[in-house]
Amino acid sequence: YLKSRGVTRNTSSFYMRNLRSAYKLAVQENLTIDRQPFHCVYTGVDKTKKRAISIPDIRKIKSADLSHRPALDFARDMLMFSFYTRGMSFVDMAYLCKKDVASGYIIYRRRKTGQKLSIALVPEMQAIICKYQNSTQYLLPIITKEDGTERQQYRNQLIRINRHLKKIGTMTGISIPLSTGQRIFPVGGNGQL
């Protein structure tokens, strides 16, 4: 079923691992008999090729005239902010707070690992921060209301920005599909264009 819907092998494996865990819990709670339905089901993970955006492509994105397309301009700015911050994840960008900026650095903890990171604030990052000043505690306007819906706002922006990045990729002739999860910090790079 999943294959017929165009779901990749790794995504299918993720779903099957979750389903298998739920089934094992049901067996432990004596809600069903263990018939081992996952005996021959692949639940491993295949290595995927990481595709980085090249510096010339980053330059194309940066120089694209999006002045009359504010939604695309915002998506581009978020991608560029990630580039300047050495590939900061979108979720970390969403939850960055103004208090995380001090003495010329952004100092934050990765949401995924809890690892504390420090990144020098460069003029290009500062320009994006100034462009999107807002009245919330958050540095960037990914989360715009502090009303308990922050996680949903993050998810909605993630979907919206990824859709806009794909449009930018098409407009600029970039062959790699752009997304917030895209590797944009080339090995050996320093975030400079």
Model-derived features: positions:
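Short, contiguous acidic/charged loop-to-helix segments that flank catalytic cores in large enzymes
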Residues: 66-69, 107-117, 148-157, 175-179
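Active-site/catalytic core of tyrosine-dependent DNA strand-transfer enzymes
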Residues: 58, 122-175
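Short, charged phosphate-coordinating catalytic segments
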Residues: 24-33, 82-103
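N-terminal core-binding DNA-recognition domain of tyrosine recombinases/integrases
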Residues: 1-49, 64-67
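Short, basic (Lys/Arg/His-rich) helix/loop patches that form interaction surfaces
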Residues: 63, 67-70, 162-193
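DNA breakage-rejoining catalytic core of tyrosine-based enzymes
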Residues: 45-63, 115-122, 137
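Conserved tyrosine-mediated DNA breakage-rejoining catalytic core shared by Y-recombinases
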Residues: 40, 95-131
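C-terminal catalytic core of tyrosine-transesterase DNA break-rejoin enzymes
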Residues: 80, 84, 88-92, 184-193
